[in-house]
């Protein structure tokens, strides 16, 4: 059972941190600490969720015009 929790934790970490820290550092030439990297990833997820919400809002708004 403990092994399942470890696998689940690793899965969520893999999904949440979908951009590898070394890739971010090589693309941007930044030298990030772990805390800065986590803050950056939280910001990326906030932007992704906002854009998803905005896209869905626009779709429902456009569909509402045709009713």
Curated annotation (Swiss-Prot):
A GO CC term attached to the entry: host cell membrane
Keywords: Host membrane, Membrane, Transmembrane, Transmembrane helix
Domain of life (superkingdom): Viruses
UniProt-annotated location(s): Host membrane
Keyword hit for Cell wall biogenesis/degradation: no
Transmembrane residue ranges: 10-30, 40-60
Keyword Transmembrane helix (UniProt): yes
Pfam families for this protein: DUF2649
Major location category of this protein: host cell
Recorded topology in the membrane: Multi-pass membrane protein
Family recorded in the similarity comment: Belongs to the plectrovirus ORF10 family.
Name by which UniProt lists this protein: Uncharacterized protein ORF10
